[in-house]
Amino acid sequence: GDVYKRQLLHLDIVGDGMLKEKLQQYAIEHDINNMITWHGQLPRVEAVKVFNSAHLHVITSVSEGNPTTIWEAMSYGVPTMSFDHCGMHDTICDRCGIRIPIAKHYEECVSAVAIEINKLLEHPERFQQLAEGTIECAYHYKWSERERFLNSLYESLLSKKKVY
């Protein structure tokens, strides 16, 4: 899957991993390295600056259950695109992000990501819609809201308890 409007894209990659060198080589061979900033590991203050300038947070991992970066992105109003599995399924909804079904083959997964990115580039107004939805959804993950929810749940359970 190719991304068609490449001139509209810039990719910021924060962090390092086992595939970094392979990905950098791929970017050079496919003449897209000029569209990528390879940040590596960043101090938190610098990583926050990258988040604040982003239009989309993309997680391509299929091994992480529910990374905290989703909530960090939400706190900055940045929607997340992720594979639809584990905790991502419960955290990301159509209002605050894009869930991509996991396919049987790697190539199908890559193609699905490219298709979703192309849809966004064809309809850039969707970035704003997702950002607004992300701000709404983020409210439910604030500690104060979680505390309120858990307290009401406990009170509900305790009120139903029989005392002998």
Residue ranges and their predicted role:
Residues K22-L42:
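Nucleotide-activated donor-binding/catalytic signature segment of Leloir-type glycosyltransferases, i.e.
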Residues R126-H140, S152:
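A short, well-ordered alpha-helix in the C-terminal region of glycosyltransferases
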Residues V62:
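Aromatic "clamp/platform" in nucleotide-sugar-dependent glycosyltransferases that forms part
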Residues Q41-L42, K49-A54:
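Short alpha-helical donor nucleotide-sugar binding micro-motif in glycosyltransferases
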Residues P79-S82:
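Short hydrophobic beta-strand element within catalytic cores of glycosyltransferases
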